[in-house]
Amino acid sequence: MSTSDFEERVVTVPLRDANDKPIQERADFAMKIVREHLAQHFSVDEAEVVLDTTVNEAVWANGRQNPPSKVRVRAARFVEDGEPVVEAEYAE
């Protein structure tokens, strides 16, 4: 693996669009927003984004009805088995 195959960044993901959804779907949709945002900014498919449980806990901390307006994640992009993969964890 060369140095160009690895990239790590701290990304702030805005989640305010989750408030446009019904109350019962907000945290679920917020998790989808995180995955879509990272896939777009790291140029990979959504299926290649792996979220750590700390991201899930941060989004669901206030319950299903009230996700945070934004969340900061530390994401790393690297190549595994010839496929680009993004792994993300919560950045405090």
From Swiss-Prot:
One of its GO terms (cellular component) is ribonucleoprotein complex. Keywords: Ribonucleoprotein, Ribosomal protein. Gene3D superfamilies: 3.10.440.10. Pfam families: Ribosomal_L31e. GO terms for molecular function: structural constituent of ribosome. InterPro entries: Ribosomal_eL31, Ribosomal_eL31_dom_sf. The keyword Ribosomal protein applies. One of its GO terms (biological process) is translation. The keyword Ribonucleoprotein applies. Coiled coil: none annotated. Belongs to the eukaryotic ribosomal protein eL31 family. This is Large ribosomal subunit protein eL31. It comes from Halorubrum lacusprofundi (strain ATCC 49239 / DSM 5036 / JCM 8891 / ACAM 34).
